[in-house]
Curated annotation (Swiss-Prot):
It comes from the Bacteria. Its main location: cytoplasm. The gene is hisA. Pathway: Amino-acid biosynthesis; L-histidine biosynthesis; L-histidine from 5-phospho-alpha-D-ribose 1-diphosphate: step 4/9. Keywords: Amino-acid biosynthesis, Cytoplasm, Histidine biosynthesis, Isomerase. The active site is at 8 (proton acceptor), 130 (proton donor). It comes from Pseudomonas entomophila (strain L48). GO terms for molecular function: 1-(5-phosphoribosyl)-5-[(5-phosphoribosylamino)methylideneamino]imidazole-4-carboxamide isomerase activity. GO terms for cellular component: cytoplasm. This is 1-(5-phosphoribosyl)-5-[(5-phosphoribosylamino)methylideneamino] imidazole-4-carboxamide isomerase. It is found in: Cytoplasm. One of its GO terms (biological process) is L-histidine biosynthetic process. Belongs to the HisA/HisF family.
Length: 245
């Protein structure tokens, strides 16, 4: 299982939100590129970037920062989400050196777009499913749909999606642990690998994900915990690498 540091971009700075509320943000750095350097030097093997302004505006806003990070680390897998709603945007990021794009809102509102994107950019498409009480939320979490996460995930199985990033909104940024039972259920209900996100606080939460014994859970995204120092990236990755269960 990979430990994947999150860099959330708002107005060019690296921030963390609580439960997806733009008005409840903490700025951790005004230099996201050096923040990326910190996590890479700490031994991370993948980065998770989110264009928060893009998620709300429906198009990339912090694209220059994303490109700068991708150019600095050409061999590092980088996934970007937020405002990805056209094939042109995906092409822009792929050309910039980003390895994976995360389709969120558009995957819920136009699931056929996912199939189209997978066909155009095989192996590069991740679907981001953000949920509240098991139902999918969209538009920067401002809207909650009547669509159930597991039902939607199954729909993407035939499309060639490389992973699903599953975020439990109630847990995100709260440092109270992630929703292990639901993450496990999702990983077992679909053949698509799952990356857990939201609420990871410390090594105990990483252990809880590993203890779930769901091979489909391939990664854990962590944000506030690594910024506030309750989780160390290198230590957590070593723990995953050496886990015997």
């Amino acid at each position: 299982m990979l430990i994947i540091p999150a860099i959330d971009l708002k107005d060019g700075a690296c921030v963390r939100l609580r439960q997806g509320r733009m008005e409840d943000s903490t700025v951790f750095s005004d230099d996201p590129v050096s923040m990326a350097a910190k996590w890479v030097e700490g031994g991370c093997r993948r980065l998770h970037l989110v264009d928060l302004n893009g998620a709300f505006e429906g198009q990339p806003v912090n694209g220059e920062v994303v490109t700068a990070i991708a150019k600095r680390y050409p061999n590092l897998p980088i996934q970007i989400g937020g405002g990805i709603r056209s094939l042109e945007t995906i092409e822009h990021y792929v050309k910039a050196g980003v390895s994976h794009v995360i389709i969120g809102t558009k995957a819920v509102k136009q699931p056929e777009f996912v199939a189209e994107a997978c066909k155009a950019f095989p192996g590069r498409v991740i679907v981001g499913l953000d949920a509240k009480d098991g139902f999918v939320a969209t538009d920067g979490w401002a809207e909650v749909s009547a669509v159930q996460v597991i039902d939607l995930a199954k729909r993407f199985e035939a499309d060639g999606v490389s992973a699903i990033v599953y975020t439990d909104i109630a847990k995100d940024g709260m440092m109270q642990g992630c929703n292990v039972p639901f993450t496990k259920a999702l990983a077992e209900a679909t053949s698509i690998p799952v990356i857990a996100s939201g609420g990871i606080h410390n090594l105990g939460d990483i252990k809880a994900l590993l203890d779930a014994k769901a091979p489909g859970i391939i990664g854990a995204i962590t944000g506030r915990a690594i910024y506030e120092g309750t989780l160390d990236v290198a230590e957590a990755q070593a723990f995953c690498d050496n886990y015997q269960g």
